[in-house]
Amino acid sequence: MGPRAKTICSLFFLLWVLAEPAENSDFYLPGDYLLGGLFSLHANMKGIVHLNFLQVPMCKEYEVKVIGYNLMQAMRFAVEEINNDSSLLPGVLLGYEIVDVCYISNNVQPVLYFLAHEDNLLPIQEDYSNYISRVVAVIGPDNSESVMTVANFLSLFLLPQITYSAIGDELRDKVRFPALLRTTPSADHHVEAMVQLMLHFRWNWIIVLVSSDTYGRDNGQLLGERLARRDICIAFQETLPALQPNQNMTSEERQRLVTIVDKLQQSTARVVVVFSPDLSLYDFFNEVLRQNFTGAVWIASESWAIDPVLHNLTELRHLGTFLGITIQSVPIPGFSEFREWGPQAGPPPLSRTSQSYTCNQECDNCLNATLSFNTILRLSGERVVYSVYSAVYAVAHALHSLLGCDNSTCTKRVVYPWQLLEEIWKVNFTLLDHQIFFDPQGDVALHLEIVQWQWDRSQNPFQSVASYYPLQRQLKNIQDISWHTINNTIPVSMCSKRCQSGQKKKPVGIHVCCFECIDCLPGTFLNHTEDEYECQACPNNEWSYQSETSCFKRQLVFLEWHEAPTIAVALLAALGFLSTLAILVIFWRHFQTPIVRSAGGPMCFLMLTLLLVAYMVVPVYVGPPKVSTCLCRQALFPLCFTICISCIAVRSFQIVCAFKMASRFPRAYSYWVRYQGPYVSMAFITVLKMVIVVIGMLATGLSPTTRTDPDDPKITIVSCNPNYRNSLLFNTSLDLLLSVVGFSFAYMGKELPTNYNEAKFITLSMTFYFTSSVSLCTFMSAYSGVLVTIVDLLVTVLNLLAISLGYFGPKCYMILFYPERNTSAYFNSMIQGYTMRRD
C-alpha cells in the first residue's frame, strides 16, 4: 500500500470515527443540492474542560446560544421558502446539512465532513476541478477566527463560503480566501460608523476595550488608526481576558477584570468602545455592576450589539447609555412564526446510513430557550437573520443561473464548487426591496444601524437611532437618543473643553485632545484650518483685538481737508501766499526805489518767488502721501526755503562788508563785487543743499511708508519718511547754520544807517526759525502720529510768514506810508550821518 493510499485510508477512518447519528431533524434536509450550515448553537460559558483534545467536543454540554439557533432557523426558513417558490429553481429541491460549531470549538471536523463524499472519503488528488463534495456551498460560521479556519480548507477546493456576521478586514483578501464572500459590511464600515458617531456628538476622549483574540486586536488597531486621523484620542486601551472554550477564568484573569474596571472609574473619559465576543463580556459586566461604574456611554461592536442574553442583564440599564453598531433590520414575512412553531427534534431519516451522519447535530433545549427570548427576538427585528437569509438566496440564484433554469424547469446536472462560485460572484437580485450583489471584495453593501438598548418592554429592545450607508460613508437619519444624563443632555467625553473662538491650544501631555486654551494676543489671530496651536500675526496693514479669528484693515491716518486744524493752517498759508504776492507786486512797482534796491534788488524777487512756491507746496501735506507729494515735501520745499535763508544771510554779509570791511579789506571787497560774490555764494549753498536733499532721499526713499501708531495699534500712520525726526535734523542742519550766520551778520550791522540796519527784522526771522525748528524736533521726540504732521505743517507756514512779513513787511510799510524816505537824497543823508558819527 502506497503513502497516498494510506493517507486516504486514514482520512476515511477519521471521518468514520467522528461520525455519529443525528438526533435532530432541524439539522438535515435531503435535496438535489445540499448547503452546509455552520452555526454556534452552543457556547462554553461554564468552563467545561475536555481532557482529550483528539475528541470532538460535544456541543450539547454547553449552554444554548439563542442567537445561533435563531440564525440556523433563518437558513432553514430560506431553504424551505425557495423550495416552495416555483419561480426560483423550479423542479429542484435544495437541502441542507447543518452543524453546531460551539462558537470556535468545532470547526475542522464539520469542514472535512462537508468536503467528503457521501461515504465520508476525502481523497487526495492533484486536480479537484471535477471533485464533487457533499455540499455545494457553506453558509457560516459567525466569527472571524472560525471563518478563517474554515476558509483555509474551502479555498483549496474553491467551494463557496458565505459568512453572515464575520466582519474582519483581513477576510477581504481574495488571494488568501478566493472562495469567501459575506453578506455583512466589513469592519472598515463598522469602525467608520463608530467614528462618525463620535464626531457627531463631539466625543474625542474615549476608552477602548478589546478581546485578546484576533477579532479584538485587529478591530482595535483599525479603530485606533481611524481615530488618529480624526483627532479623537484614546484615553487608554485594555485587553479583556478571553473566555477560552475549555478553561475556567483564572484568579489572575479575574484580578485583571477588577483592575480594568477600577481604571474605568479613575478615567475622565465617559465613552467606552468594546470590541469583544459576547462570551467574554458576562464576567466583565458583572464586575462593572459590582464596582458600580455608571454614567458612561457604551458603544458595542456588532458581536454583542443585539445580544439578547446580555440585554437580559437588566441591571445594565443603570450603567449608562448602550449604543451598538449592527446590520440594518429587514423584516422577513413569516419568519417569527416559523421560528416559534418549527420542529425542535425528531428521529433522523431512516434512509441515511450511519456513516453519513456527523456529530453536533442536536439541540434538545434550543427551541425552549428560544421561546423564552421570543419577544426580544421578535421586537429586535431581523438583522443578522437577513444576512443568513440573503446568503441562502444568493446561492439559490447562482444555482438558478448555473442550471440554466427557466420559468418552469431546470437542467439538473453535476455542479462543481468552482462553477457555482463563479456564478455567485455574478448574482444581482432584489430581495425584500434590497439589492443583493457582491463588490470586488466579496461584500454586500447593506447599510448599518446605530441601535440603543431599551429595557422598557413596550419598546423595541434595540431601537434604531441612526443609519450608516457604506457606499456614501455617511451617518444619516440621526434621531433623538434617551441619554442617561440629567435633562437628557448629550454626555460629554472630552479631555479638554473646546477652546473659544480666537483661543489657541497649548498641548498638555501626549494626547492631542488634552490642551489648555490661551487667548490670542492683540495683533494676532487663530486660523483653525491651518494651525490650532499657534496664533498667526496679522499682516502689516491689518490688526486684531484679543481672541480674534481674523484681522481687520488698520485705519489709515493722514491729514485731511475736513479737519479743523488743517483748515486753520490752510487759511494761514493762504494769507501768507496773498501777502507775499502783494509784496511782490509792490516791489515790482517800486523796483528802482532805494528801499527795494537796498533790500537786495533782483535778489528780493528771487526770494519772493521762492516763498510763493513754498506756500504752494503746503497743500501737498494734506491727503494720502504719494511719490509726487513726498518729492515736493522732501525736495522742493526745503530747497526753496534754504535759498530764501541763504539770500538773507548773504545780504546781511554784503551790507556788513560794504560799511565795515570794504575800507579794511578793499581788495577782497573788490573781488566780491567784481565776481558777483552774492550770487556765487547762493549758487554754492544751493548746490550743497541739493546734495543734502539727494542724500536724504536716497537714504529714506520717496515711496510713502506706513507705521503703526504706538498709542493705538489699530491705526496706521501714512508718511513720506518713517524716520522723519532724524531726517529733519539732517535736512535743516544747513538752514540752521545759515540762520545763525545771518543773525550774526545782522547783529554786527546794528550800528549801520537806519535804512540799511536790518538787524531787528533778520533777528526776528532767523530767531523764530531756529527756535521753531528746535521745538519741532523736541515735539517729535515726545509725540507721534498725525499730530506731528499738523505741527510740522504749522511750523513750516509760520517760518514762511516770518520771512514774508518779518523781513519784507517793514519795507513795504516804508514804501507805502513813508514815500519821502524812499528817495536817493534821504538815503544819502543817512549814509553821510553814519560816516560823520564814525569819524
UniProtKB/Swiss-Prot annotation:
- Disulfide cysteine pairs (residue numbers): none
InterPro entries linked to this entry: ANF_lig-bd_rcpt, GPCR_3, GPCR_3_9-Cys_dom, GPCR_3_9-Cys_sf, GPCR_3_C, GPCR_3_Ca_sens_rcpt-rel, GPCR_3_CS, Peripla_BP_I
Q: Does the keyword Transit peptide apply?
A: no
Q: Which residues lie on this side of the membrane: Cytoplasmic?
A: 588-602, 657-681, 749-760, 806-839
- Top-rank taxon of the source lineage equals Eukaryota
According to its UniProt entry, one GO biological process term is: detection of chemical stimulus involved in sensory perception of sweet taste
Q: Which residues are glycosylated?
A: N84, N248, N292, N312, N368, N407, N428, N487, N527
* Compartments where located: Cell membrane
One Pfam family name is 7tm_3
Q: Which family does it belong to?
A: Belongs to the G-protein coupled receptor 3 family. TAS1R subfamily.
Q: Which PANTHER family match?
A: CALCIUM-SENSING RECEPTOR-RELATED, TASTE RECEPTOR TYPE 1 MEMBER 2
* Subunit and partners: Forms heterodimers with TAS1R3.
Q: What is this protein called?
A: Taste receptor type 1 member 2
Organism expressing this protein natively: Pan troglodytes
